Regions:
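Hot-dog-fold acyl-thioester-processing enzymes
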Residues: 1-84, 150-151
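HotDog/MaoC-like acyl-thioester-processing domains
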Residues: 2-13, 91-100, 104-151
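Short amphipathic alpha-helical patches
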Residues: 52-59, 71, 90-98, 129
Length: 151
C-alpha cells in the first residue's frame, strides 16, 4: 500500500473527497444498538414497524461511528493531531438495513493556530450519503493538523 502524507499545507479549500462504501445490515444495526442505544426502533423489528420510521433504523451515534470509519479512508491521518469538535450535526434521513453509505468531505476553511506555530485548524463539511445520493448525516468537523516539519 502506498502511504500518502497529508499535512495542513496540503489542504486545498473547496476540494471535495468522496470515500466509501459501507453497507449497513440488520445485524450491524441491532448489535450496535443493543450495546449503545437500546431503543426499540434500533433493536426490535416488530416494534420498529409501529414507529414513524416503519422499520429498523440505525442509531444516530452508530451513523456517526460509520462516518468516522469512512473518514479514516481519507489520507490525512499522518497530519491529524486531534479533533477540535463537531458543529451543526444533523440527521437528515434514517439509515436502514441495506443502505450503502459514502462519505463526502469538502474542505471549507483553514487558519494557522494562533498559539502553536507547528499546527493549523481545518474545517471540513462532512456529508454521509446513501446509495440514492440522499444526505443522511451532515456536520462541520474541526480538525487540528500538523504543519510539515521545518515550516
Amino acid at each position: 500500500m502506498i502511504r500518502v502524507h497529508v499535512f495542513y499545507e496540503d489542504i486545498e479549500l473547496g476540494t471535495t473527497v468522496r470515500v466509501g462504501s459501507y453497507r449497513v445490515d440488520t445485524d450491524d444495526i441491532v448489535s450496535y444498538a443493543r450495546r449503545w442505544d437500546p431503543l426499540p426502533v434500533h433493536i426490535d423489528e416488530q416494534a420498529a414497524k409501529q414507529t414513524m420510521f416503519g422499520g429498523l433504523t440505525a442509531s444516530g451515534s452508530h451513523t456517526l461511528a460509520i462516518r468516522t470509519l469512512l473518514l479514516h479512508r481519507v489520507p490525512i491521518q499522518d497530519g491529524v493531531i486531534a479533533a477540535g469538535g463537531w458543529d451543526e450535526v444533523r440527521f437528515h434521513k434514517p439509515v436502514r438495513p441495506g443502505d450503502e453509505l459514502w462519505l463526502e468531505v469538502t474542505w471549507v476553511a483553514k487558519r494557522p493556530s494562533a498559539s502553536k506555530p507547528d499546527r493549523g485548524v481545518v474545517t471540513a463539511l462532512m456529508k454521509l450519503l446513501n446509495q440514492d445520493g440522499d444526505v443522511v448525516l451532515s456536520h462541520r468537523d474541526v480538525i487540528i493538523m500538523r504543519l510539515r516539519k521545518g515550516n
